[in-house]
Swiss-Prot record:
GO terms for biological process: translation. It comes from Desulfurococcus amylolyticus (strain DSM 18924 / JCM 16383 / VKM B-2413 / 1221n) (Desulfurococcus kamchatkensis). This is Small ribosomal subunit protein eS1. Pfam families: Ribosomal_S3Ae. InterPro entries: Ribosomal_eS1, Ribosomal_eS1_arc, Ribosomal_eS1_CS.
Length: 213
């Protein structure tokens, strides 16, 4: 590498500033990490992956992957919004047992404050169940999660998912139909956010990208 090229690379790093990536207030507003950029607008739209363990310090939550998206810059802080979560596949595989059934439901739900969230719920039975019992359990999931979402804000709903309150309540209702070993909210994804013009896709585009388009 020529000395001139090394100088250019060095100068580019000198131009960069470090920004503190901050979790939403619903996750305590803690620092998720830091990232460099020569232009803060380049950070907008970037997705940050972490785990619930990194936020709470509880090692039993290391399998819960969280996704936050940078939506704005405030001074040297990159502010984020919850984008979704997913349980580690190895963890989900460890829950599966022979001679039992797995019932999955995917629902697009509306929160009280106008967000639309796609939720994937998985119920694992103690024994193998029949088709009609699976349908009944899936119906319990649907009725419960639609009602619950309509009563809570997005932040409240996400916290009840993370605390296993929703999983436990669904399991309790489903056990009236068939023995349930476990219920997990396997995955969530933010689809729509409220706006004065009505719900709009939860897509964050960097101002730089918008100008290029």
């Amino acid at each position: 590498m020529s000395s001139k090229h090394r100088a250019v690379v060095k100068d580019k790093w000198k131009m960069k500033k470090w920004y503190e990536v901050v979790a939403p207030t619903s996750f305590g507003g803690i620092t998720l990490g830091s990232t460099p950029a020569d232009d803060p607008e380049k950070l907008i739209g970037r997705v940050i992956e972490t785990t619930l363990y990194d936020i709470t310090g509880d090692i039993t939550q290391v399998h819960v992957k969280l996704y936050f998206q940078i939506i704005s810059i405030d001074g040297n802080k990159a502010l984020t919004r919850f984008k979704g979560h997913e349980l580690a596949r190895d963890y989900m595989r460890s829950l599966v047992r022979r001679k039992s059934s797995k019932i999955q439901g995917i629902f697009d739900i509306n929160t009280k404050d106008g967000y639309v969230l796609r939720v994937t719920i998985v119920a694992l039975t103690s024994y193998r169940c029949n088709t009609s019992q699976k349908k009944a359990i899936r119906r319990v999931m649907r009725e419960y999660i639609f009602k619950k979402a309509s009563e809570l804000t997005l932040d409240e709903l996400v916290q009840e998912i993370m605390s296993y309150k929703i999983s436990n309540e669904i399991a309790e209702l489903a056990r009236k139909i068939y023995p349930i070993r476990r219920v997990e909210v396997y995955k969530t994804k933010l689809l729509l956010i409220p706006s004065p013009e009505g719900p709009k896709p939860a897509v964050v585009i960097s101002p730089l990208q918008a100008r290029e388009e």
